[in-house]
Amino acid sequence: MRPEPTNAPAALSRRFSVAPMMDWTDRHCRFFLRQLSRHTLLYTEMVTTGALLHGDRQRFLRYDECEHPLALQLGGSVPAELAACARLAEEAGYDEVNLNVGCPSDRVQHNMIGACLMGHPALVADCVKAMLDAVEIAVTVKHRIGINGRDSYAELCDFVGQVREAGCRSFTVHARIAILEGLSPKENREVPPLRYEVAAQLKKDFPDLEIVLNGGIKTLEACREHLQTFDGVMLGREAYHNPYLLAAVDSQLFGSEAPPLSRSEALLRLRPYIERHQAEGGAMHHVTRHILGLAQGFPGSRRFRQLLSVDVHKAADPLRVFDQALELLAGR
């Protein structure tokens, strides 16, 4: 196998991705994760159509070129608005647009966004068709295996079937139902049981579709096992809290021969990015809040977290604090 060029972005593959996570997968987090893996598909936080069409569009769409392959996740349910936002994403250079049909929070439900849309498969199909008609880039859907009151396998197949008829070819399946009343988003990630067998049956019954599994996956060993059944795996919180897991993704899941980046090398690559962010008036903690898990499992990990989450706010020269944190990971 020939060595890969290290400067060119990898081709879009959904074999391994990091989930869209509110307040977490912002552009600074994605820049950091990209240092660890070239091939991982990265997703933005969910952006609502209203925010893009009526808010600070540049802020929501901004990213660094190194973040490719990169997908924008949209929240909305008005086909024309989603089509307009998909065009904005394509014009901004995103590789994919993903529709959120999985978020269970009350706040988004009131705006007909997220998991509640699983009860309206024809509307989701209309939304997907409008986006596909508007852009050349991929349009995908992330959804649950059901919602309370509509959680039979037949209803899941009806949902996927209608959205497939609209032209969608890639579905990311969070293998839990969403309970739309009485549970917080956090509880909705923990209380409904994981049912990988339902997602596996979906792949069996829709062999022509790309089915990516999401929910509760914590190790690359588990990823390899699931990839025997599914076309891809998506990690969420584990990738955020234990980011160095991504350093082995390219070799273990994509066959890359490039040596993995060390933790200290990842921090060194982050330093000029932080300097640029500060030069634009940004604060260092906007970036470093995303790297607190990098020292997980090492002596000094507590000090590392304290430096970057507490001391950084008191420092006259935050970069000096960053360099102290870097020293704790020297050679690792």
Curated annotation (Swiss-Prot):
Active-site residues, Swiss-Prot/TrEMBL: C103 (proton donor)
Pfam families: Dus (PF01207)
Record-level Gene Ontology MF annotations: flavin adenine dinucleotide binding; FMN binding; tRNA binding; tRNA-dihydrouridine20 synthase activity; tRNA-dihydrouridine20a synthase activity
PROSITE patterns xrefs: UPF0034
Domain of life (superkingdom): Bacteria
EC identifiers of the protein: 1.3.1.-, 1.3.1.91
Coiled coil (UniProt feature): none
Binding site for FMN: P20, M21, M22, Q73, K142, H174, N214, G215, G216, G236, R237
Catalyzed reactions per annotation: 5,6-dihydrouridine(20) in tRNA + NADP(+) = uridine(20) in tRNA + NADPH + H(+); 5,6-dihydrouridine(20) in tRNA + NAD(+) = uridine(20) in tRNA + NADH + H(+); 5,6-dihydrouridine(20a) in tRNA + NADP(+) = uridine(20a) in tRNA + NADPH + H(+); 5,6-dihydrouridine(20a) in tRNA + NAD(+) = uridine(20a) in tRNA + NADH + H(+)
Gene3D superfamilies hit by this protein: 1.20.120.1460, Aldolase class I
Cofactor: FMN
Key words, A-Z: Flavoprotein, FMN, NADP, Oxidoreductase, RNA-binding, tRNA processing, tRNA-binding
Residues at the site labelled Interacts with tRNA: N100, K186, R189, R302, R305
Entry-linked HAMAP family: DusA_subfam (MF_02041)
Family: Belongs to the Dus family. DusA subfamily.
Function field: Catalyzes the synthesis of 5,6-dihydrouridine (D), a modified base found in the D-loop of most tRNAs, via the reduction of the C5-C6 double bond in target uridines. Specifically modifies U20 and U20a in tRNAs.
Protein name in the entry: tRNA-dihydrouridine(20/20a) synthase
Lineage, opening ranks: Bacteria, Pseudomonadati, Pseudomonadota, Gammaproteobacteria, Pseudomonadales
